[in-house]
């Protein structure tokens, strides 16, 4: 039976303090579930139902170290088709995409993807939203120790030569997941579309004056959005691809802002868009 694996390291930055066992276990369970489910989706290009959890993509505990609690674990893929797909795309690309989906679930701008990772992601366009929805509760579980004890948690991919930091969760990312509010009054922004999923109407924009992109979706059912608006968003992404700053074209977007407990905008719910 073909078996492939990817090595990871999870570190709870607790300093000299002992880690509460219950909170630590819930945090690790969240990481295990989010990573395994995301991997299953990437390698099968399907989203498993909440009633089924793949036995052939599992996280296995390895050795642990004491002090800022560090836990090594191995993601083991025993299904021959998924194993072959992992060998084809490589551990690095898989890790990029795991990071991408978990960052999106946290309303955090993901790191830029390599061309190879972008190519794999493009084939998942129809299920991107479903993957994020599927892991959302696991991502909340990942934050148990950050919410309870304010400890950051860092995930790294391990290789024989070095470790690669994938992402960090902390109080700030936790604030994006709990007690979100949506403004009752709409706002107008000038923005460019930086990523757009034509199947779901979601993804990211960069508003004038901002340094990071913010996710968006339409406030109503995507099936009810006018074709002209969908085309406008898609064309803006295409028109601004690899052009000089002075040639960038912006859209005037009306939206309701979704905010975290700090008042920061984590998502725009779009009501309308037009050319200025």
Model features per residue range: what roles?
Residues 2-186:
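Charged, alpha-helical interface segments at or near domain boundaries
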């Amino acid at each position: 039976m073909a078996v492939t694996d990817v090595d990871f390291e999870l570190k709870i930055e607790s300093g000299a303090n002992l880690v509460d066992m219950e909170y630590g276990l819930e945090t690790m369970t969240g990481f295990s579930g989010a990573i395994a489910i995301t991997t299953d989706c990437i390698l099968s290009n399907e989203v498993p139902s909440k009633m089924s959890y793949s036995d052939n993509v599992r996280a296995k505990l390895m050795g642990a170290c004491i002090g800022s609690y560090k836990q090594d674990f191995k993601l083991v893929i025993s299904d021959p088709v998924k194993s072959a797909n992992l060998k084809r795309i490589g551990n690095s690309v898989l890790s990029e995409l795991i990071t991408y989906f978990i960052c999106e679930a946290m309303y955090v701008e993901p790191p830029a993807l390599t061309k190879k990772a972008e190519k794999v992601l493009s084939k998942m366009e129809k299920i991107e939203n479903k993957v994020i929805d599927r892991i959302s509760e696991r991502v909340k579980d990942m934050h148990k120790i950050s919410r309870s004890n304010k400890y950051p948690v860092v995930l790294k991919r391990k290789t024989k030569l070095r470790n690669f930091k994938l992402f960090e969760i902390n109080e700030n990312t936790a604030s994006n997941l709990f007690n979100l509010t949506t403004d009752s009054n709409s706002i107008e922004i000038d923005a460019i579309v930086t990523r757009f999923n034509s199947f779901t109407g979601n993804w990211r924009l960069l508003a004038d004056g901002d340094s990071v992109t913010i996710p968006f979706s339409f406030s109503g059912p995507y099936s009810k959005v006018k074709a002209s608006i969908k085309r406008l968003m898609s064309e803006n992404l295409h028109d601004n691809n690899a052009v000089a700053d002075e040639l960038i074209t912006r859209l005037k977007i009306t939206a309701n802002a979704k905010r975290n407990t700090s008042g920061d905008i984590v998502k725009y719910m779009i009501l309308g868009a037009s050319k200025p």
